[in-house]
C-alpha cells in the first residue's frame, strides 16, 4: 500500500473512531448525569486529571519509545529494537508499582485533597481506585502499542478503539440498569476497556512485529537512560500543557464548589473532543515522518509536513465553526437541566487555544522524530507558567 493510500486509510479510520466516540459520549453523558447527578459526574473528569498527574512519571521513558524502536526496525537493527522493547516493558512494570503507591495514598486520603461530600466519598474513592488500576495496566502494556505505529497501520488502533468504546458503553449501561446507579461503575468499565485494548495490542505485536521478542535478558539500563535523557523534555512539555489547561477542574473544586466543577466538566466535552480529533489526526502523520527520517528521505519528509499542515488547517477549523454557530442550541438539547448559555461560553473559551495552534500541531511531531525536544518544551512550560 502506498504512503498516500495508507495515510488516507488511517485518517478515515481515525475520523470514524472519533465520530463514534462523540456519538457515544453524546448519549452516554446525559444518561450518567441523569442517574448520578451533575456534581458526581464532575468527579469523573477530576479523577482522570489526578491519574494524568500521577502518570507524568511514565512520560520521560515512553515518549520516545516508538521512535527508537521504529528507527531500528527500518535500519534492520532488530537486536537493538528488541533491547529497547524489553527495556521499556520492564521499566514500565517498575513504574507501575510507583503508580500503585501514589494511587493508594490519593485514594486513602482523598477527602484531604478535594472537596467531596461524605455521601459521595465511598463511591469517589472506588472511582479513583479503578481509574488508577486502568492507568497501571495501560502503563505496563503501552510498549505493545508500538507495533501499529512501526508498520504505519494506525487504522488497527482506530478499529480497536471503536470496539473498546462500545464495550465500555455496554458495561456502563448494563451496570446502571441491573444495579443501583453508582459512580464507580465508570471506573469498572474503564478497566474492562483497557484490558481489551491490552489483549489486542499483544496480538498486533505478534502479527506485525514477529521479529520483536520480549525477554528479560534483552533489558539494558543504557537503553533506559537514553530514552529518559531525551524523553524528559516531553515530561516538561506535558507539565506545561497541564499548567495551560489541566488544573481547571481541581481549582474549581477547591476554590468554588463541586457543582461548578461539574458544570465546567460538561462544558469541556466539546473542546476535549475537538482536541481529541486534532491529536488523533496529528498522530496519523507521525509514523510516516519517523519512517522517512529513518530512511534518510528528507525531501519527502518536508513535502509530507507541508501536506499535513494543510490537512490540519481544515480539520481544526470545521468543528470550531460548528460549535460557534450551533453550540448554544446543542447544549440546550444535550443537557436540558444545565444552563446552556454558561456551557456555551465556557466551551468557546476552551476552544481559543485550538483556533491558533490546531493547524500547526503536526509540526510538533518533528521534535520527537529528530529527538530534539528541549526548545519546544521550554516554550510550552513558559506559556503554562504565564
Outline where the language-model segments fall.
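Interhelical loop/hinge segments that connect adjacent transmembrane helices in multipass membrane
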Residues: 1-7, 122, 183-187, 201-245, ...
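Alpha-helical transmembrane segments of multi-pass membrane transport and lipid-handling proteins
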Residues: 19, 89-115, 174, 199, ...
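Hydrophobic alpha-helical transmembrane segments
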Residues: 158-208, 268, 382-386
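Helix-loop junctions and terminal segments of transmembrane helices
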Residues: 30, 59-75, 150, 209-210, ...
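Helix-terminus/linker motif at the lipid-water interface of multi-pass membrane proteins
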Residues: 26-40, 112-115, 176-179, 242-273, ...
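Membrane-interface junctions at transmembrane-helix termini in multi-pass inner-membrane proteins
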Residues: 4, 136-163, 173-174, 184, ...
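C-terminal transmembrane helix end/exit motif
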Residues: 1-4, 19, 101-108, 146, ...
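Signature of the first transmembrane helix
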Residues: 6-71, 100-104, 169, 229-259, ...
Amino acid at each position: 500500500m502506498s504512503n498516500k493510500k495508507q495515510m488516507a486509510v488511517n485518517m478515515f479510520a481515525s475520523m470514524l473512531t472519533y465520530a463514534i466516540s462523540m456519538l457515544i459520549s453524546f448519549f452516554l453523558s446525559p444518561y450518567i448525569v441523569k442517574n448520578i447527578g451533575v456534581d458526581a459526574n464532575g468527579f469523573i473528569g477530576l479523577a482522570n486529571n489526578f491519574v494524568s498527574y500521577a502518570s507524568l512519571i511514565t512520560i520521560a521513558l515512553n515518549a520516545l519509545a516508538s521512535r527508537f524502536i521504529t528507527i531500528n526496525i527500518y535500519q534492520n537493527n532488530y537486536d537493538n529494537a528488541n533491547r529497547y522493547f524489553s527495556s521499556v516493558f520492564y521499566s514500565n512494570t517498575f513504574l507501575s508499582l510507583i503508580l500503585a503507591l501514589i494511587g493508594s495514598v490519593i485514594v486513602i486520603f482523598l477527602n484531604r485533597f478535594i472537596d467531596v461530600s461524605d455521601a459521595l466519598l465511598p463511591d469517589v474513592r472506588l472511582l479513583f481506585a479503578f481509574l488508577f488500576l486502568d492507568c497501571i495496566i495501560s502503563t505496563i502494556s503501552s510498549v505493545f502499542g508500538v507495533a501499529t505505529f512501526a508498520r504505519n497501520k494506525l487504522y488497527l488502533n482506530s478499529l480497536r478503539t471503536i470496539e473498546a468504546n462500545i464495550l465500555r458503553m455496554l458495561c456502563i449501561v448494563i451496570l446502571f440498569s441491573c444495579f443501583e446507579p453508582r459512580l464507580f461503575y465508570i471506573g469498572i468499565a474503564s478497566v474492562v476497556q483497557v484490558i481489551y485494548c491490552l489483549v489486542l495490542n499483544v496480538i498486533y505485536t505478534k502479527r506485525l512485529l514477529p521479529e520483536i521478542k520480549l525477554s528479560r535478558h534483552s533489558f539494558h539500563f543504557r537503553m533506559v537512560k537514553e530514552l529518559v535523557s531525551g524523553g524528559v523534555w516531553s515530561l516538561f512539555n506535558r507539565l506545561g500543557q497541564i499548567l495551560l489547561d489541566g488544573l481547571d477542574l481541581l481549582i474549581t473544586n477547591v476554590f468554588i464548589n463541586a457543582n461548578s466543577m461539574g458544570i465546567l466538566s460538561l462544558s469541556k466535552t466539546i473542546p476535549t473532543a475537538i482536541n481529541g480529533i486534532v491529536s488523533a489526526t496529528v498522530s496519523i502523520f507521525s509514523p510516516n515522518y519517523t519512517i522517512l527520517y529513518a530512511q534518510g528521505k528528507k525531501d519527502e519528509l518536508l513535502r509530507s509536513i507541508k501536506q499535513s499542515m494543510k490537512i490540519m488547517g481544515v480539520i481544526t477549523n470545521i468543528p470550531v465553526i460548528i460549535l460557534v454557530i450551533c453550540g448554544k442550541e446543542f447544549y440546550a438539547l444535550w443537557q436540558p437541566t444545565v444552563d446552556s448559555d454558561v456551557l456555551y461560553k465556557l466551551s468557546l473559551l476552551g476552544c481559543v487555544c485550538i483556533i491558533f495552534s490546531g493547524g500547526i500541531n503536526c509540526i510538533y511531531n518533528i521534535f520527537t522524530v529528530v529527538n530534539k525536544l528541549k526548545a519546544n518544551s521550554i516554550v510550552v512550560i513558559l506559556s503554562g507558567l504565564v
